[in-house]
Amino acid sequence: MRIGILSKNYAAKRLFLNKLANAIYKDIRFYNYYLWKNAHLWFLKIIGKLNMSPEEQASKLFYDYKAILPTKCDLYHFFNTINYSKKQPWVISVESGVPWPLEVIRCVESSNADLSSIKNNRYVKRALYYLSLPNCRGLIALSKCSQNIQLEILNQFPEYKEQIVKKLITLYPPQDLIIKSISEKINYTKKSKKFTFIYVGRDFFRKGGRETLQVLSELKKKYDFNLILISNLRIDEIKYLRSSHDIEDTKKLINDNLSWIEFHESLPNNEVLEKIKQSNVALLPTWMDTYGYSVIECQACGTPVISTSLRALTETNDDKVGWLIKVPVNKLNTPIHNTKEEQDIFHDTLSKELYKTIEYVLLHTDEVQTKSQNCLKRIEKYHDPQKYAKKLDLIYNNKISELRNNV
């Protein structure tokens, strides 16, 4: 089977690239009409002059596909991108919901998650029409949260809902076990003389790095532990900064505490995994993540995670395998922090609950090993790569009904 793809990025590697042994994968991005239509925007992006938020860039540049020449593919597998074809078989992996223009994003992120205003959106209606056609063989949601967002979009368009729901299914991303047993994990953690936390994240402020450092600095006055911090302190969106001197304050806090903070701007992935294996607990007190792949990577290392309770994190993490920090979310489990007042509430809640949770862990370190064991069991149960590949093969061969009947 020849499968057309648009990227070999992290998401593609995670979800579908090289998942089937008998498949050949072909990059078909340069066949895309919309790529050439938006060539001027791509040029501005390349030279760093495209004045758009990451969300605007994605909605303008990545979410539409129409082949201008025959691609000679048996099937396409896209990530969040709509295929505007009535004949070419295709499958789409859904991160949040599709289609995903700015109007839908703003509605999903609003405090009441009211999507009624999109009913007259012609772009959304056109995309759903193509999703409803028989040549679209599957909408694969990354989580139940993603599936719920998709259903809320479909509720606004009942004329397409029945046909699309028939091919909507949740498949959790595959993940190999990185360590095989709890005894192996114990041997790794023995290498650290003190209880060790780890924080890994390029998008430092969005993923709660600021709050992590502030809270741990306070707790260090009462408890003895170390932190491994792997981040280039990147800012992906300005809205996650709390002040104009956040970056300077963060760098100073790190430099003033290098006696217990092991800081790396970046490391090769194999070295990152070694650090995770040696750590007792990982931290992801994120302001926003649609899935949080790092959670399942940490769990595959037998390292339980402290995370916020938003989007898919309530599915990948719970009190059996880790610790959840409750933060303000709407009915679609999307965090509420659009206004300055909402951001203040979110920050204060996150900081307070993170402090309480980390202190609890430090006072109950005996719980960590049990959660570590449960992490390994959870990865085996929900993220088995072989089972995932078999399900993907059924979807590609237009047999998604067999999977849905067994859910």
Region annotations inferred by a language model:
Residues F43-K45, I92-A127, V329-K331:
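Acceptor-binding helix/loop patch of EC 2.4 sugar-transfer enzymes
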Residues S59, I345-K356, Y360-N397:
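A charged, aromatic-enriched C-terminal amphipathic alpha-helix characteristic of glycosyltransferases
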Residues L131-K166, L177, S244-H245:
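A short, active-site helix/loop in glycosyltransferases that binds the activated sugar's phosphate group
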Residues I140, Q175, I179, Y188-K207, ...:
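Conserved donor-binding/catalytic core segment of Leloir-type glycosyltransferases
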Residues S231-L233, Y240-L273:
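Nucleotide-activated donor-binding/catalytic signature segment of Leloir-type glycosyltransferases, i.e.
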Residues L273, I296-A300, R311-E315:
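Short alpha-helical segment that forms part of, or immediately flanks, the ligand-binding pocket
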Residues W287:
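Aromatic "clamp/platform" in nucleotide-sugar-dependent glycosyltransferases that forms part
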Residues P304-S307, N317, W323-I325:
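Short hydrophobic beta-strand element within catalytic cores of glycosyltransferases
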